[in-house]
């Protein structure tokens, strides 16, 4: 079995490059690819970090990057190292543009339906739904990522977004003065990420939620001191275990998920050395 290193470089989630790689390698039963994922590469600083990794582990590079400056830097680097650097859909886009007479506006996405990646995504979505809000804790070992945080810190939508990118994410709420699941006392080899938020912002979100549900009796849910303690306690739990913490106060769901994916793949790439 021939082993081959593949670097997947993308300004989004690397799923397009991953689809293409899986489909292509399905034609080579004697090749065992080792995939290194480099998602959300959107500036030269991040790209340079990836280039240093590629230099230390030579392999074929597949990329989907819209920014022309980043594309040029990547292809020039690979050319100098004499390693293949392939735009996953660049040839397709160029041919469509030539045939239609319409200039390229931006890089488009595409899918290979019903392949292994497709079904992995479905399984990840199913997992996220079944393990939402602290459910089925006995199956946490199957997760790629576990999110913890106070109520209304976007754990559920972030879990679903991660699932659409093929990652199994469970989420567990932290409630002040309530026992936290004992999994945190175990030596688990899983990525656990804490989500926190500015207390004032969290109170606004919770008040809007209570108004929507026409609930007026849950005072502790929007009490500043309690909300603040919840966020501080989550930070404390994570700091004690060297788990990363993300402040979602000014981040969209996509931005939060992208940061988590970067942490996840950096961790995975490190363990694959």
UniProtKB/Swiss-Prot annotation:
The keyword Transferase applies. Its EC number is 2.7.11.32, 2.7.4.27. It catalyses: N(tele)-phospho-L-histidyl/L-threonyl-[pyruvate, phosphate dikinase] + ADP = N(tele)-phospho-L-histidyl/O-phospho-L-threonyl-[pyruvate, phosphate dikinase] + AMP + H(+); N(tele)-phospho-L-histidyl/O-phospho-L-threonyl-[pyruvate, phosphate dikinase] + phosphate + H(+) = N(tele)-phospho-L-histidyl/L-threonyl-[pyruvate, phosphate dikinase] + diphosphate. Keywords: Kinase, Nucleotide-binding, Serine/threonine-protein kinase, Transferase. ADP binds at residues 149-156. InterPro entries: Kinase-pyrophosphorylase, PPDK_reg. It comes from the Bacteria. The keyword Kinase applies. GO terms for molecular function: ADP binding; ATP binding; phosphotransferase activity, phosphate group as acceptor; protein serine/threonine kinase activity. It is an enzyme of class 2 (transferase). Bifunctional serine/threonine kinase and phosphorylase involved in the regulation of the pyruvate, phosphate dikinase (PPDK) by catalyzing its phosphorylation/dephosphorylation. Belongs to the pyruvate, phosphate/water dikinase regulatory protein family. PDRP subfamily. PANTHER family: PYRUVATE, PHOSPHATE DIKINASE REGULATORY PROTEIN 1, CHLOROPLASTIC. This is Putative pyruvate, phosphate dikinase regulatory protein.
């Amino acid at each position: 079995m021939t082993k081959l290193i593949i670097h997947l470089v993308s300004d989004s989630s690397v799923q397009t490059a991953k689809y293409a790689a899986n489909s292509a390698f399905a034609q080579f039963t004697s090749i065992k690819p080792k995939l290194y994922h480099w998602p959300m590469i959107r500036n030269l600083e991040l790209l340079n970090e990836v280039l240093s990794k590629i230099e230390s582990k030579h392999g074929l590079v597949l990329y989907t990057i819209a920014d022309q400056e980043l594309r040029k830097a990547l292809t020039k680097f690979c050319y100098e190292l004499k390693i293949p650097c392939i735009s996953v859909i660049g040839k397709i886009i160029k041919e469509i543009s030539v045939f239609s007479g319409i200039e390229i506006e931006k890089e488009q996405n595409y899918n290979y339906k019903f392949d292994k990646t497709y079904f992995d995504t479905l399984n990840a979505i199913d997992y996220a739904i079944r393990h939402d809000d602290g459910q089925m804790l006995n199956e946490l070992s199957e997760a790629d990522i576990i999110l913890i945080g106070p109520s209304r810190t976007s754990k559920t939508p972030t879990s679903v977004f991660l699932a659409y990118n093929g990652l199994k994410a469970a989420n567990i709420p932290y409630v002040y003065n309530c026992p936290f699941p004992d999994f945190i006392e175990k030596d688990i080899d899983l990525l656990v990420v804490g989500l926190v938020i500015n207390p004032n912002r969290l109170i606004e979100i919770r008040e809007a939620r209570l108004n929507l549900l026409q609930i007026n009796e849950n005072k502790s849910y929007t009490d500043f001191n309690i909300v603040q303690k919840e966020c501080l306690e989550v930070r404390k739990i994570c700091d004690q275990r060297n788990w990363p913490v993300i402040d979602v106060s000014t981040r969209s769901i996509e931005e939060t998920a992208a940061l988590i994916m970067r942490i996840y793949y950096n961790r995975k790439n490190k363990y694959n050395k």
